């Protein structure tokens, strides 16, 4: 019963929309988390639109999994840059506790602290601070772990199912 109530409450907080017809509905937001296609041109175009409608205090975070902040911020004002950072969620978001945050060179301490507090205290995430390098830290380390696991699987003659049974839920990875 509580799950049904929680789902109903959540559905009132989330409204589906698109960037062409519904962007104006974001004009009073304090935090916008962008999660669109991983293309610099698309992100820059969206940030141009957001900068025109958001209040000056609004924080904009990108959920990019590896695009550089420097490139995403080309053409943005200093005010926008100080309220911008990366919030890299790991999938599946509802199960993965990790949230990698990445500051840009102009990101203010106030913005960084507010997003860290929000991620930790409101979303219940474990926060790590990454660097503005290609694919940040989580993906760069994760791919090496994945390749080592595949190598060990092949070397030991294990099946993918064997590896999943060892490295999946027993090690707190979602199944």
Please tell me what each predicted stretch does:
Residues 1-30, 40-41, 45:
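Conserved N-terminal Rossmann-fold NAD(P) cofactor-binding segment
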Residues 9, 33, 53:
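Catalytic or ion-coupling anion/metal-binding cores of large enzyme and transporter domains
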Residues 34, 38:
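Residues immediately C-terminal
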Residues 39-119:
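Rossmann-fold NAD(P)-binding glycine/threonine-rich loop
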